[in-house]
Swiss-Prot record:
The keyword Transferase applies. Its EC number is 2.5.1.78. This is 6,7-dimethyl-8-ribityllumazine synthase 2. Keywords: Riboflavin biosynthesis, Transferase. Pfam families: DMRL_synthase. It is an enzyme of class 2 (transferase). 5-amino-6-(D-ribitylamino)uracil binds at W18, A52, L53, E54, F76, V77, V78, S109. The active site is at R84. Catalyzes the formation of 6,7-dimethyl-8-ribityllumazine by condensation of 5-amino-6-(D-ribitylamino)uracil with 3,4-dihydroxy-2-butanone 4-phosphate. This is the penultimate step in the biosynthesis of riboflavin. NCBIfam families: PRK12419.1. Pathway: Cofactor biosynthesis; riboflavin biosynthesis; riboflavin from 2-hydroxy-3-oxobutyl phosphate and 5-amino-6-(D-ribitylamino)uracil: step 1/2. InterPro entries: LS (IPR034964), LS/RS (IPR002180), LS/RS_sf (IPR036467).
Amino acid sequence: MTILSHPSAKIAIVRARWHADIVDRCVDAFVAQWTKLGGSAADVEIFDVPGALEIPLHAQALARTGRYAAILGTAFVVNGGIYRHDFVSGTVLDGMMRVQLDTDVPVLSAVLTPHNFQESEPLIAFFRDHFVVKGEEAANACAQILDARAKLALVDA
């Protein structure tokens, strides 16, 4: 486990509200792990968007403020029968990647697309638990990328 070298870093989380009962597990786990790493829950700001497709634009607006050291986008994209969920997820991830490349603010992803999801209690319970793991992993990755970027800043100095 990495202990934060930047414990006062501000982090934004952009979360989709579709399947909020699942997605919120990621957010809660991120904040819990962030505090275990030495960060403050008060430095994590949460922003809600309707669905996954809105994450990149919202992340871009947040990145452009210069206020956040990193941004996490989280959503649960499932096949709703209207359009292909893998297309939606790919579009969201491409947008998030473009945001971080254009703004130089790391944008992490916990946008998950199960191959086959059905609204059954066993699967819902599985993904609730899985999003806890993903939230913890995202907090660890966030700490690691902030450390890596701090080392890059020393190279540029």
